[in-house]
Amino acid sequence: MCHGRIAPKSTSVFAVASVGHGVFLPLVILCTLLGDGLASVCPLPPEPENGGYICHPRPCRDPLTAGSVIEYLCAEGYMLKGDYKYLTCKNGEWKPAMEISCRLNEDKDTHTSLGVPTLSIVASTASSVALILLLVVLFVLLQPKLKSFHHSRRDQGVSGDQVSIMVDGVQVALPSYEEAVYGSSGHCVPPADPRVQIVLSEGSGPSGRSVPREQQLPDQGACSSAGGEDEAPGQSGLCEAWGSRASETVMVHQATTSSWVAGSGNRQLAHKETADSENSDIQSLLSLTSEEYTDDIPLLKEA
């Protein structure tokens, strides 16, 4: 104001004021933004001994801004001291605020010591079961062969193979079935039924008397061939019994022949000589029979 008048403003001052006001406003805005940005960045989280951390989302961004989440992990054989293992960046700080550390896992050693015996028990049980199954399979496979071998041994014992036993340290050979029944010389053929021979001798004429005698001779010869010093007791008894039957048959023939000779005394001399030769053959057959049956021969002659 000059002498009651208002002086006009200088244009240069107005220009400086206008420029200063235009520059200050952006600076204020920039400072505000920088302050907010610096306040939202969190420092690096503490890393525990024998452990570490991972970021969510991965990978970890630098710097760790607000909203970043980290997860703590421990090395093998260690575990976190607390149950909570996640931290979140809020307003430049990690929330919740707590101390993170990894400690030695004592339960792991116990589990390891208990696992070794358990594994050995399981292995031994599995081996035992496998061995039992193998034995069962072998028994099933070998059972037919064992049965066939048993039958073959039994058949050999019946068919005549000698079986030996030990008696007071001495090996004694047992006789086979055939040797025990028939003797060591073989089979002894039984003679024909004497009753059939009696009927033939009674129904035949002078020319038919030689038939029963010829049938008796091979039988007696078969039994006599089995005799001797090496004859088995079983065969001796059988042959003696068959010889007694033959002697009885021959004696009946002799009695029949004697009665026939007495009834035909006036026949020709040739028939008489034939009867005498037949009687001599019968006497020779009787001499081959057993001594224990000789007492019955006179009774048959008297009859």
From Swiss-Prot:
GO CC field: membrane
Cysteine pairs bridged by disulfides in the record: 42-89, 74-102
Protein topology in the membrane: Single-pass type I membrane protein
Entry's localization field: Membrane
Keywords: Disulfide bond, Membrane, Signal, Sushi, Transmembrane, Transmembrane helix, Tumor suppressor
Segments for region (Disordered): 199-237, 263-282
SUPFAM superfamilies xref list: Complement control module/SCR domain
Classification via InterPro entries: SUSD6, Sushi/SCR/CCP_sf, Sushi_SCR_CCP_dom
Side of membrane Cytoplasmic, spans: 142-303
Signal peptide: 1-39
Domain annotation Sushi: ranges: 40-104
Sequence intervals crossing the membrane: 121-141
Extracellular side: 40-120
Induction: Up-regulated by chemotherapeutic DNA-damaging agents and by p53/TP53 and/or by p73/TP73 in response to cytotoxic insults. Up-regulated by lipopolysaccharide (LPS) in monocytic THP1 cells. Up-regulated in umbilical vein endothelial cells (HUVECs) cultured in THP1 monocyte LPS-induced medium.
GO process terms (BP): DNA damage response
Role of this protein: May play a role in growth-suppressive activity and cell death. May be involved in the production of chemokine molecules in umbilical vein endothelial cells (HUVECs) cultured in THP1 monocyte LPS-induced medium. Plays a role in preventing tumor onset.
Protein name: Sushi domain-containing protein 6
Source organism per UniProt: Homo sapiens (Human)
Classification lineage: Eukaryota, Metazoa, Chordata, Craniata, Vertebrata
Gene behind this protein: SUSD6
